[in-house]
Amino acid sequence: YNIKINKLMFASLDELDEYAKTCGRGSKDFRDLIGYNGSLRKIIESCKASISYPPHGLPILLNGPTGTGKSFIIEKMFEYGKNNGIFSEKAKFVHVNCSEYANNPELITANLFGYKRGAFTGADNDNPGLIKVADGGMLFLDEVHCLKPECQEKLFLFMDKGNYHVLGDSENEYHSNVFLAFATTENPKEVLLKTLLRRIPIQMEIPSLSKRSKMEKSNIIVRFLENEAKHIHKEIRIGNVVYAALLNNEYEGNIGELKNVIQETCMNALYSNKNKDYIEINSLCLPSRVRFNNHIDNSILVGRNQLYSLNDLKNKY
């Protein structure tokens, strides 16, 4: 269990198991993030501190290129909050991708803060708003740079005291206790109002895949291959040539692009190994954009291919 046991006697193994689960709740938070003790260590520590700060945490902004895992880290923050009693079991995680509203800024303002029936054409029913839906939980505004200044202004006014007005009801003031998390791929100082930025005390930059260590990149590759093996219900055997190509390739889309490359590679391998209990990944299974990438030494792809199981790969590299 890898926990400290303070009780000496248990009526059954089931009681011991339940005790261990209770004591260990939260002990593995963030630990399944590759880079937990490496490139992401300080970021994770700041995430924990941010969400734990009384009474309702401190707003946090994650900045970094697309595909670096910003959304995943925010989701882990919410898990951490639930597992450590910061959020109740009923607390909700509300994820809003602001880029979906880039061409309709009025709609996102209405959806965030709510509106009354008849407030505008098409408002056939009352809408409490996502800020109210997330009350007691977390509201994550992804691609926050897509918010128009008017919406940003209304947002930072809400952040001051937790009070706001619903569209179509200027007489009544509403309240919500919600933890706010933000993410952007842009330079926050260039796309966000200074008045909003001043209200976000925790601002962290997520490193691109190219800035992470070879070991972390290798572990990410193996993790994705393991996920695909579970998905297709077949053992995966991968050549050292393919592994080297995946490791040395440059990914503009970062972890997200690497995941897509591995899925396409496994798809090609599965198609070529239909009648086998396992799939064998060779260099021909790689997407052409990886095989013909100028950043990869061609000698890698013509080298002697040796197959490894995923366990062998983890032990070797």
Features from the language model and the residues they span:
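Conserved post-Walker A coupling segment in P-loop NTPases
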Residues: 49-121, 137, 145
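Dynamic helix-loop-helix/coil hinge segments at AAA+ ATPase domain boundaries and subdomain interfaces
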Residues: 19-44, 106, 245-252
